[in-house]
């Protein structure tokens, strides 16, 4: 009996030592032999929200995502436009003039999509404007909000029909015949490429395209119809139809394809990648309330619009709780559920917490719509921040809290949050 008692006490000692070690990792070690543990639940209800413009880089690299093109009028955020900057390569070497004579007879822009393509806004046949870029665009230009190139030439405007109602998932291609002026431009550029460069043993197709891209800077494609939709295109290319004949006047036709290029000229600090940029013209609902706190609704607009900042003024009372270990800290933010049938729900929000003046977040987490329960709310778990907060002992006002949508979130839509009902739920262990 005595041996069993000694064994039981030994096991209990090991378990309590392990508990002390784990809680110590949270930054608040305890002495199990002296302290009484009690699990409690509390909440912080007064979160002070405001929304502000997100003026950071509004560029989406289409090579990593998809090509988003279109425009629409959001009932809250106003006019939103997505446009494409498309540098283009030849998929194979250009024609060798030393062997053939040639004539470009047709140029066709191909835009590929299917019924799974993302549509944001009302499905309407958009008016497409296609410009030729006259000069290269620097990295800094691309990173400028609402940037517009100063040197470009309008090639054409054309209304196209978008069919996203079919039940098939097969690719569909909308084609636009490019004008004679574009054919002349491409013809002149091809003839300026030295055949020695185009067919040198030391140069491959990419090297030839680098020569070509110094002469042809690509296309700028946008829609001029305000209340349409933003559509996700899977691909964009140009077919160049060419008639060739040899020294014996044998005639043939072939197709040279121009495809999207995908590299960065780091030496000259110039992008050679397809990029998507967004233009935003806010409505009065936004402009009248930017920066104001305690709004009934807080609007989060992705695709470079607006983000929310908030404060935890009631969080400082926890600084007096020196004998507390955080088990769970969950921030819940309800979502406005009014009808938005023309707009898909936002699938993701990101929460970032920074030290004031800090460039990089000390805590970050995300929440997607797939995880939204019947309570229609976002939930963020910030245990790591609460532990950090209690350990540092600084006021909550020394931190910056942001809710944003990711730049590359193609399926993003506006989010209408209800800050009055936002809460931070805290489950903790208290000992004394």
Predicted regions and their residues:
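Secreted, disulfide-rich extracellular signaling modules
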Residues: 2-13, 19-432
């Amino acid at each position: 009996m005595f041996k069993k008692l000694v064994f039981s006490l030994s096991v209990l000692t090991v378990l309590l030592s392990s508990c002390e070690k784990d809680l110590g990792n949270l930054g608040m070690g305890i002495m199990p032999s002296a302290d009484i543990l009690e699990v409690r639940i509390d909440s912080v209800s007064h979160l002070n929200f405001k929304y502000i413009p997100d003026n950071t880089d509004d560029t989406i690299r289409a090579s990593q995502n998809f090509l988003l093109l279109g425009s629409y009028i959001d009932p809250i955020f106003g006019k939103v436009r997505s446009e494409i900057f498309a540098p283009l390569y030849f998929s194979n070497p250009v024609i060798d003039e030393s062997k053939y004579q040639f004539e470009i007879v047709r140029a066709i822009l191909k835009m590929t999509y299917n019924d799974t393509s993302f549509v944001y806004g009302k499905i309407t046949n958009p008016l497409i404007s296609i410009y030729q870029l006259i000069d290269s665009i620097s990295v800094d230009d691309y990173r400028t909000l609402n940037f517009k190139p100063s040197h470009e030439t309008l090639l054409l405007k054309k209304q196209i029909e978008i069919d996203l109602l079919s039940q098939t998932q097969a690719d569909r291609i909308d084609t636009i015949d490019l004008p004679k002026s574009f054919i002349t431009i491409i013809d002149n550029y091809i003839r300026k490429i030295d055949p020695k460069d185009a067919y040198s043993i030391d140069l491959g197709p990419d090297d030839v395209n680098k020569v070509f891209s110094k002469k042809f800077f690509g296309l700028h494609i946008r829609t001029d119809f305000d209340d349409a939709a933003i559509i996700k295109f899977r691909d964009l290319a140009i077919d160049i139809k060419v008639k060739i004949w040899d020294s014996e006047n044998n005639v043939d036709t072939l197709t040279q394809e121009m495809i999207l290029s995908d590299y960065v000229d780091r030496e000259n600090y110039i992008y050679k990648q397809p990029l998507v940029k967004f233009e935003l013209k806010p409505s009065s609902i936004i402009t009248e309330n930017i920066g104001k706190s305690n709004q009934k609704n807080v609007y989060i607009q992705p695709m470079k619009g607006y983000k929310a900042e908030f404060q935890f003024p009631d969080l400082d009372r926890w600084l007096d709780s020196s004998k507390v270990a955080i088990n769970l800290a969950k921030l819940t933010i309800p979502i406005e559920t009014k009808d938005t049938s023309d707009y898909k729900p936002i699938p993701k929000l990101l929460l970032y917490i920074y030290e004031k003046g800090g460039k990089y977040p000390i805590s970050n987490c995300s929440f997607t719509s797939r995880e939204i329960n019947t309570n229609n709310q976002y939930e963020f778990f910030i245990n790591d921040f609460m532990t950090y907060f209690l350990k540092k002992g600084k006021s909550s006002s020394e931190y910056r809290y942001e809710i944003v949508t990711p730049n590359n979130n193609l399926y993003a839509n506006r989010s209408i949050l209800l800050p009055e009902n936002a809460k931070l739920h805290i489950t903790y262990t208290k000992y004394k």
